[in-house]
Amino acid sequence: MLLTIDVGNSDTVFGLFEGEDLLEHWRVSSKGRRTADEWAVVVQNLLHFDSLIHGDIDGIAMCCTVPMVQNEMRQMFRRHYGDVPAVIVEPGVKTGVPIRMDNPKEVGSDRIVNALAAARLYGGPAVVVDFGTATTFDAVSARGEYVGGAIAPGIDISVEALSKRGAQLHMVEIIKPRSVIAKNTTEALRSGIVYGFAGQVDGIVDRMAQELTDDVDDVTVVATGGLAPLVVDECETVDVHEPWLTLIGLRMIFERNT
């Protein structure tokens, strides 16, 4: 089985594939420093929790946006999974995605993985919206090229900043409000968060689609990321919600490199 690992600034998501089937997935916090051995304990506990053992893993694929974690993960692979082929998405790894950027090396590996998965699953042109620590928008051409994107503050950090800077505002559970026109502060915050971010997504996606092609109806918009369920149903431009897009892309990249 293939173990896929998507390390983000807030969470690390693990996925276990058998062939093309995602058998299981887990989410743990990326915050706080863990050593290579501690990450190995996390992985082993997750596998044993589902009655899986070390010997079941015959491949590993990872993308990571946190350099410190990537270094520890790399050591963990060598120390605890030395006989298992491991692919880390970084410069030199075959992705099959031409990167049309001023500096291709500065593009986050998760964004390239998402672009590959979107192009392979749905075809181009496409826009991937990833709701994470930041909300990222990634544009894929009709030829499957990564042609650029946009980065906006994510939902959680925006809410946190608002509660810290607003003397009479507080943290709220982010759920769909009863109406856009709220009757109390809690509902007003929820309305602004849910419909504000949905409007942001629709606005940026519309503009990207116009730059990608003359026929905007040809553009497939794919939403992913841990925070997508909070607003994706209110986004008029989103065609597909694929929560495991990054894990699927990692599986595809592993297959290209082994």
UniProtKB/Swiss-Prot annotation:
The record lists the catalysed reaction(s) as:
(R)-pantothenate + ATP = (R)-4'-phosphopantothenate + ADP + H(+)
Listed binding positions for ATP are D6, V7, G8, N9, S10, D11, T12, V13, T133
Q: Which GO terms describe its molecular function?
A: ATP binding; metal ion binding; pantothenate kinase activity
* Keyword ATP-binding included in the entry's annotation: yes
The note on the cofactor says: A monovalent cation. Ammonium or potassium.
Question: What cofactors does the UniProt entry give for this protein?
Answer: NH4(+); K(+)
| Keyword NADP set for record | no
What protein name is recorded for this chain? Type III pantothenate kinase
Superkingdom of the source species: Bacteria
List of residues binding substrate: G108, S109, D110, R111, T185
User: Cellular location of this protein?
Assistant: Cytoplasm
Family annotation (PANTHER family): TYPE III PANTOTHENATE KINASE
What are the annotated disulfide bridges?
Answer: none
Q: What keywords is this UniProt entry annotated with?
A: ATP-binding, Coenzyme A biosynthesis, Cytoplasm, Kinase, Metal-binding, Nucleotide-binding, Potassium, Transferase
Q: Which family does it belong to?
A: Belongs to the type III pantothenate kinase family.
Q: Which organism is it from?
A: Thermobifida fusca (strain YX)
Write down the HAMAP family for this protein, in alphabetical order.
Answer: Pantothen_kinase_3 (MF_01274)
